[in-house]
Amino acid sequence: MQETLGGPEKYYEAFQAKLAEVEGTDDFAFEIKKEAITKAGDGIIENRRAIAQKQPGLYSVVWHPLGGCPSPEVFCQVSDALQEIEGAEIRLALDETAYIVNLTAGEAQKFIDMTAGDSAASLFEMASACIGGAICQQGVRDSQALLRSCAEAVQKAGIPDGALPAIHISGCPGSCATPQVVPMGFRGAVKDRQSAWLLYLNGCDAQGQEVFGKEAGVILETEVPDFLVELGKKVAESGMSFAEWSKANADGVEKVAAKYF
């Protein structure tokens, strides 16, 4: 759409024009009121899942269930706990992460403990996956099943945190999980009449640096976990993070993936 309108600036102008048109003619019949956060902190917490807010002494807790699918039991525990805490709420991100916000250090620790067994333990487990063909009527492949099998294989192989990126997986060309705009993504496909996944590499969604990833090749579903484990070991041997390694080895991922295509 940006290209059709003449670039990002023209797209922005068109959006602002439509926004002004709507704001000038429609009565939304509601008013959004900004609620001030007045609660005070009760200490300091240092945890990779705790993020300090701009309000002194308050924190947000990162909660990322694998594939964005929380345990119903944990979900209910979190919901019940939220009712008892002043100003606390959940905010959802586009990558299937939930942020439990407006917490004191003590409250943050409570939610960290509550969700400890139902949240990503590594960068790789921060992966995103669409709901997949097991539920979606348009889905070609089961994204959630692939992510679970990959996470289990990576964990079993002892791949260190940071050696693999947070992949995005979509079961069909609809690409709900945006596999084309991240360092590594997969999209449902077919190979030799078998379930398979198209590998995307080097995508980016950062403003001003937007680019669709390269379609590197198609890998059989049964071999995707093996590919990721081999890649993770290769990166780990270098002592670098995946981001550092891929920058230093522009075609490194494709070399590892070549035998799986």
Where in the sequence are the language-model features?
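Peripheral terminal and linker regions in Fe-S/redox and tRNA-modifying enzymes
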Residues: 1-261
